[in-house]
A protein has these predicted regions:
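Conserved, well-structured interaction surfaces
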Residues: 48-68, 89-166, 181-183, 187-194, ...
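Short coil/turn linking the two alpha-helices of tandem helical-hairpin repeats
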Residues: 163-164, 170, 238-241
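Glycine- and aromatic-rich loop/turn segments at beta-sheet edges
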Residues: 168-175, 205-217, 259-266
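Short, compositionally biased low-complexity segments
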Residues: 26-35, 95-99, 169-170
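Short linear capping/connector segments at secondary-structure termini
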Residues: 37-41, 104-105, 173-181, 214-217
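An aromatic- and glycine-enriched ligand-binding surface/loop that stacks and positions planar moieties
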Residues: 28-92, 193, 201, 207, ...
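Sec-dependent bacterial lipoprotein signal peptides
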Residues: 2-25
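Secondary-structure transition into beta-strands, especially the periplasmic turns and strand N-termini
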Residues: 4, 24-26, 137-152, 239-251
């Protein structure tokens, strides 16, 4: 009887080992089909031109949340870029909620972490396209080169904003394929400017990137050489390279862009109307979305209770910013012409 029990135990033990071995062999890397059925996997995007084009559009899509928010006015990632400069203030009742306007924001503030995340989303997506779109079998070389140029512009746009704020950030110029290459140290401000200029120079030298899209073109709103010249000119201004900036801005005009003057004396006002959002003065603009609940960020923060639901105009143009404009006759702006005694008023007044 004891011998039978021992034999039985050995059989059970052997069967368990065999079952475990079978389980381990059956759980190999190719045992489960991990390809999602409800969306496109990353490995499939570069197999068709239609999918690759959606990846390019996905880079542009980062603009949607930045410029066309559909909820909230205090979310830090929806605060206009103006808030991080000297051109905007906020009213006294909300000053504690707007540390970005008072210089009281800290490095740990969500105001900055949200911007950091958004622009690195730009960079991550752009790098993915730049590194991989060359694999697409049914896309022409010209289409691939144009897409790469567009994504280099968008990458440069993101790095420019980051470099203005942080004066040096980690520089990623290739897609992140593993955790090991996703933990770079901070690059110097000069190195980031150099990378930005190289991207924009590649754009203006790309023969497959058009100088300008005309109004009504199905590609209107996409990156052009004119936009690349304009952005590179801004970079040169940040570097105080004035002559290079002037040359680039002249090149913008050479691409077919120019001031909107068709409305005569009211041209500047009419420029900001929907009817003229594709006029010759618009170099690179986010188009209006005619969809309920969406609104331009400035409509929300500078508007009234009628814009985007029930929004408030707690952001106010800084008086010094207003003073930087000339009058219609070319004279220097003077508050006393509009508010007599303004220049002699005390701060509390």
């Amino acid at each position: 009887m004891k011998n039978k029990i021992k034999i039985f135990r050995k059989l059970v033990r052997c069967a368990s080992i065999a079952l475990l071995s079978f389980s381990m062999a059956g759980c190999g890397a190719d045992f489960l089909d991990t390809t999602p059925t409800n969306n496109i996997s990353g490995s499939s995007i570069w197999t068709k031109a239609t999918l690759a084009e959606q990846a390019v559009i996905g880079v542009y899509n980062v603009f949607l949340d930045q410029y066309c928010p559909n909820s909230g006015i205090l979310d830090s990632h929806r605060i206009p870029w103006d808030a991080y400069s000297s051109v905007m203030d906020t009213d006294k009742n909300w000053i504690k909620r707007m540390p970005n306007c008072t210089g009281a924001a800290t490095p740990s503030s969500g105001l900055f972490s949200d911007i950091y995340k958004r622009f690195y989303t730009f960079i991550y997506r752009a790098n993915d396209v730049i590194d991989n779109i060359g694999q697409v079998p049914d896309m022409s070389t010209g289409e691939k080169q144009r897409a790469i140029a567009e994504c280099k512009f968008l990458r440069a746009f993101a790095y420019m904003r980051l470099n203005i704020l942080y004066k040096g950030v980690p520089l990623y110029m290739n897609a992140i394929t593993s955790p090991e290459n996703g933990n770079k140290a901070r690059s110097s401000e000069a190195d980031v400017w150099a990378a930005i200029l190289q991207d924009l120079t590649d754009c203006v030298n790309e023969p497959n990137l058009p100088g300008k899209y005309n109004s009504g073109d199905s590609n209107y709103g996409r990156v052009t050489k004119g936009a690349a010249y304009a952005l590179r000119g801004q970079v040169y201004m940040w570097q105080k390279n004035w002559e290079a900036a002037v040359d680039d801005f002249n090149s913008v005009a050479d691409c077919g862009f120019g001031l909107y003057t068709k409305a005569g004396a009211t041209s500047y006002k009419q420029l900001l109307k929907i009817a003229n959002e594709q006029c010759e003065e618009m170099i690179f603009s986010v188009q209006c979305i005619k969809q309920y609940g969406y609104s331009n960020t400035r409509n929300i923060t500078y508007g009234n209770r009628c814009t985007a639901g029930s929004m408030w105009n707690n952001y106010l143009p800084n008086p010094h910013f207003v003073e930087s404009f000339e009058t219609a006759t070319g004279e220097k702006f003077n508050w006393d012409n509009y508010l007599p005694g303004y220049s002699t008023m005390k701060e509390k007044e």
